[in-house]
Amino acid sequence: MNAIQISWVLAAEDSARLATFYSELFQATLKPGLAEHHCIVQFSDGTQLEIYQPSRRRPFPARGKALAPCLRLSPSQEPLPELQRLLSNALQRGGSLLEEARLEPFGAEAWIQDPEGNPLLLLAPLESVAPTS
């Protein structure tokens, strides 16, 4: 299981508005994300900023703590088991769980902290909804 992409994720109350702000400010490409409330800003160097409205199942991140790296796995028909394997590996190596892995309409996700306490989103997209490059 290899990660295919690392990007940044930014929680927003209005993801479309914030994505438009960043794409226009940096003359970057605005792409649709995995869901209606998810947008991807693609910069000229290939870096991506994924702007999303958090699930109602989790609290909105505190201001100033809404930006985190996202480790996106290869799309899968069975994203939750893929994510759980990576999560188990991360915990064995000193990471800690912030939020349990859960299945969402776009795939599976879990929030962890690295050994120094930095937040990290682990994302396993559902193969049928994975965005194309």
Language model segments and positions:
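Short, conserved charged micro-motifs
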Residues: 16-18, 77-85
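Domain-length accessory/inserted modules outside core catalytic folds
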Residues: 15, 47-49, 55, 62-66, ...
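Vicinal oxygen chelate
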Residues: 7, 87-133
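N-terminal beta-strand motif that seeds the catalytic metal site of vicinal oxygen chelate
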Residues: 1-20, 69-73, 126-133
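Short coil/loop residues immediately preceding or within conserved phosphate-binding loops
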Residues: 36, 68, 107
